[in-house]
């Protein structure tokens, strides 16, 4: 949005105000000005001159000698190579000492590149030249914005241009233009009237809005045209008027200048008037050739499946059912609503009657269509931010008035107006004290009311209680904090004293759920795992690749209506799909080892489609592959195995104070049935872990052994023991023994440890499996398992004899289970 200060000055009294100071104040008060542009910057001393005569240069065929009247006593002589000059033409002249811009640069603010060129008098092939005549480009003017002027050679000005006047007085080159950086919530400021109201409120200046009236003539529009809304949720208001006896031509210079200040190219008086009203009032309009609209009827509806339209740019567009269109009486799309008109109903030089549209469309719908079609415009941008329905009638009457004043059209009697649900003014109730407390000042109520009324709020006050009616054009306000912000910014943020916020310091604490999650995370990180964060979405196709059988509860996933990607159409019911994608990505990047985990919510609906909020709970899952050891350390190259993952899970339970759990074979389908386990307590599975099933690895294209785990947090919550265990530092030394056992292959480690602990007595302090072997040197049907046993007494030093007795007792107990010492 650009704001011409010349134009703004016709709406609000800003005479004598410094443009730079004004821009700074607007920015501080929440209406940010990105750049202050001076279109004529770089042009100095360039005046208009009339060519009196043109002669050929005696020594150069490509040069011409021109005598010009520049408003001085004597004509001046300028030598030029331009071939388009003739006697009687008015041209811009840069005489000696004048400055012209170095170049035009569309990427620079205002299109002007820094630096200029100073003109000096001189000689061309022996003939004196007092300066130069200028082309459009040499004045730094964007040729695209001046379609009526010649773009080649010297700029030829209109015949009625006075002689000897500064070029700044033409085409508003003496204007100052603000390039605004408005936030999307301030949709009201995307118009000159909105900016005038805001400027008047901030600077306490009088605002004079245009007086709008229409001189209606001829037969009424009813019965000759109609407008309809098929879905009121997507079109809040639809106004229509009929212009007759239209004369297509150029717009007045002042309208063209104001359009150019916003970078809009003048086209013809009808299109220019529509663009002008959009800039002035903020309501986009669309014009149709009345005689080309079938049935003279316009209907706002959603596009049909497979429907197409040729837009004004000549491109055929494929529409989809989410796009809004304006259809004619034959139900054919005549316009992509709020985005671009149709080619078949375009206003041309032959147009005699124009059907006007002033409508308010759904912001989200216009945004989707605009992005999908790649069509962004001033109109679609305004619709995306929100349009006030009350401005529709004002805008359509304004364009009629402008064209009537130009003698370019007459307006048929009456206005078509479909307005299904009229907008009601928003009322906010609050108090002076609440607003003051929110801002942190003590403003008198009279001053507060004055500020609100300057912003066009209607205020009723009684004993400090305020009933505030929000103006219809402020769509961004909804409650007391918004009112407080309005008061604060107009009062001036710089006037609010800086204070240090006060608050009582209270001891913070985590909830039990937070504490459990923190402890699990801390334990996993301490064991060398890295936390990852994936999307809360998944694709149910990945569940099959994880070996989950059809009918498993993880398939009961909530579909997402508007997924961010086709790869994530469902809410996740397990963390494993996201982790598997992370793991495969790491493998593709040649990362040969990784230990990762994720914590997060999963979503389990009771039924689909949803009738109530789904069950949402926390899980932990992780995956490990490669070597846990860093290069240069002992055991370098050792790969993760089942006992690593088991130890990690045991450490988690230890961190939570959970004891007396059982270990069972896992039935979790993701894991290898023979190399996996569950920790179970009170009939609840606390965690499942093990090596990933070979079928899973094959489906994901992984050729390494991968170990994983799933921790069911809800099952743990009521088992966490907050008791802090304390044991004294031992006074007496321990005695250690190693047992190398020949164990039947069907025996589990858990069964062996249970026998040893029962036989070992109360002085057996620790028991640790440190070696497991099956191979050629071990009897068939058996495996070798080696344990380290630590014995200690609290009241004395144990003798070797005592320890040997317990070892004999343990060996006898093991023998009953066919477990013997290795020879």
Stretches found by the model and what they are:
Residues 1-216, 355, 372-374, 378, ...:
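Phosphate-backbone binding interfaces of nucleic-acid-interacting proteins
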Residues 203-229, 407-435, 442:
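Terminal amphipathic helices with adjacent charged low-complexity linkers/tails
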Residues 48-78, 257, 268, 274-346:
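Conserved mixed alpha/beta core segments that line enzyme active sites in large multi-domain catalysts
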Residues 3-9, 174-183, 236-244, 378-385, ...:
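Short, hydrophobic beta-strand segments
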Residues 428-594, 737, 790-792, 802-823:
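Extended, well-folded interaction surfaces typified by the phenylalanyl-tRNA synthetase beta subunit core
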Residues 125-134, 138-140, 149-154, 168, ...:
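Mobile "lid/hinge" segments at catalytic clefts and subdomain interfaces of large enzymes
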Residues 2, 450-457, 467, 543, ...:
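A carboxyl-terminal module marker
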């Amino acid at each position: 949005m650009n704001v011409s200060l010349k134009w703004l000055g016709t709406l609000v009294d800003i005479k004598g105000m410094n443009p730079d100071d004004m821009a700074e104040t607007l920015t501080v008060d929440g209406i940010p000005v990105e750049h202050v542009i001076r279109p004529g910057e770089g042009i100095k001393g360039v005046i208009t001159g009339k060519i009196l005569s043109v002669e050929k240069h005696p020594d150069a065929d490509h040069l011409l000698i021109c005598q010009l009247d520049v408003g001085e006593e004597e004509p001046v002589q300028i030598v030029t190579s331009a071939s388009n000059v003739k006697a009687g033409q008015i041209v811009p002249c840069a005489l000696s000492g004048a400055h012209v811009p170095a170049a035009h640069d569309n990427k620079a603010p205002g299109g002007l590149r820094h630096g200029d060129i100073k003109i000096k008098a001189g000689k061309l092939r022996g003939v004196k030249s007092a300066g130069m005549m200028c082309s459009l480009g040499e004045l730094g003017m964007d040729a695209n914005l001046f379609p009526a002027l010649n773009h080649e050679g010297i700029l030829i000005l209109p015949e009625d241009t006075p002689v000897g006047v500064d070029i700044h007085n033409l085409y508003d080159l003496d204007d100052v233009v603000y390039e605004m950086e408005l936030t999307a919530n301030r949709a009201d400021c995307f118009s000159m009237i909105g900016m005038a109201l805001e400027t008047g409120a901030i600077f306490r200046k009088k605002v004079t809005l245009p007086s709008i009236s229409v001189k209606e003539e001829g037969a009424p529009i009813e019965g000759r045209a109609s407008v309809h809304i098929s879905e009121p949720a997507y079109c809040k208001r639809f106004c229509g008027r009929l212009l007759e006896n239209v004369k297509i031509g150029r717009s007045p210079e002042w309208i063209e200048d104001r359009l150019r200040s916003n970078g809009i190219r003048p086209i013809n008086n009808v299109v220019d008037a529509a663009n002008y009203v959009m800039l002035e009032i903020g309501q986009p309009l669309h014009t149709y050739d009345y005689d080309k609209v079938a049935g003279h009827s316009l209907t706002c509806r959603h596009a049909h499946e497979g429907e197409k339209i040729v837009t004004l740019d000549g491109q055929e567009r494929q529409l989809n059912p989410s796009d809004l269109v304006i259809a004619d009486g034959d139900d054919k799309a005549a316009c992509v609503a709020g985005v671009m008109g149709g080619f078949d109903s375009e206003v041309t030089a032959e147009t005699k009657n124009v059907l006007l549209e002033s409508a308010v469309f759904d912001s989200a719908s216009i945004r989707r269509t605009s992005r999908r079609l790649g069509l962004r415009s001033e109109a679609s941008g305004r619709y995306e931010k929100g349009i006030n329905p009350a401005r529709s009638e004002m805008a359509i009457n304004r364009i009629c008035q402008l064209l009537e004043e130009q003698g370019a059209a007459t307006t048929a009697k009456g206005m078509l107006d479909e307005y299904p649900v009229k907008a009601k003014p928003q009322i906010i109730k609050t108090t002076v004290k609440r607003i003051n407390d929110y801002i942190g000042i003590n403003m008198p109520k009279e001053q507060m009311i004055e500020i609100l009324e300057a912003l066009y709020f209607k205020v009723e006050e009684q004993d400090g209680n305020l009933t505030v009616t929000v103006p219809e054009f402020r769509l961004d306000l909804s409650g007391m904090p918004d009112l407080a912000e309005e008061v604060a910014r107009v009062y001036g943020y710089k006037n609010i004293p800086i204070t240090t916020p006060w608050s009582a310091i209270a001891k913070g604490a985590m909830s039990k759920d937070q504490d459990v999650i923190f402890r699990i995370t801390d334990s996993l990180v301490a064991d060398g795992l890295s936390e990852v964060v994936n999307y809360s979405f998944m694709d149910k196709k990945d569940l099959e690749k994880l070996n989950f059988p059809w009918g498993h509860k993880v398939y009961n996933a909530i579909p997402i209506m508007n997924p961010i990607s086709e790869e994530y159409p469902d809410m996740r019911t397990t963390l494993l799909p996201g982790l598997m994608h992370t793991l495969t990505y790491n493998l593709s990047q040649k990362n040969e080892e990784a230990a990762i985990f994720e914590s997060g919510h999963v979503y389990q609906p009771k039924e689909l489609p949803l009738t109530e909020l789904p069950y949402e709970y926390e899980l932990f899952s992780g995956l490990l592959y490669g070597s846990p050891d860093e290069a240069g350390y002992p055991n370098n190259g050792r790969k993760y195995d089942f006992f690593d993952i088991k130890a990690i899970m045991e450490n988690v339970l230890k961190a939570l104070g959970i004891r007396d759990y059982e270990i069972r074979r896992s039935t979790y389908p993701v894991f290898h049935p023979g190399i996996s386990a569950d920790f179970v307590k009170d009939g609840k599975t606390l965690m499942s872990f093990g090596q990933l099933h070979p079928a899973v690895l094959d489906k994901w294209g992984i050729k390494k052994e991968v170990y994983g785990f799933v921790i069911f947090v809800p099952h743990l919550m009521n088992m966490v023991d907050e008791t802090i265990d304390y044991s004294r530092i031992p006074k007496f030394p321990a005695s250690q023994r190693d047992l190398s056992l020949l164990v039947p292959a069907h025996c589990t480690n858990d069964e062996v440890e249970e026998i040893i602990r029962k036989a070992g007595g109360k002085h057996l302090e620790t028991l640790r499996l440190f070696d497991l072997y099956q191979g050629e040197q071990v009897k068939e049907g058996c495996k070798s398992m080696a344990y380290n046993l630590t014995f200690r007494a609290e009241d004395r030093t144990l003798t070797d004899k005592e320890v040997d007795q317990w070892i004999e007792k343990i060996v006898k107990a093991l023998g009953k289970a066919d477990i013997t010492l290795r020879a």
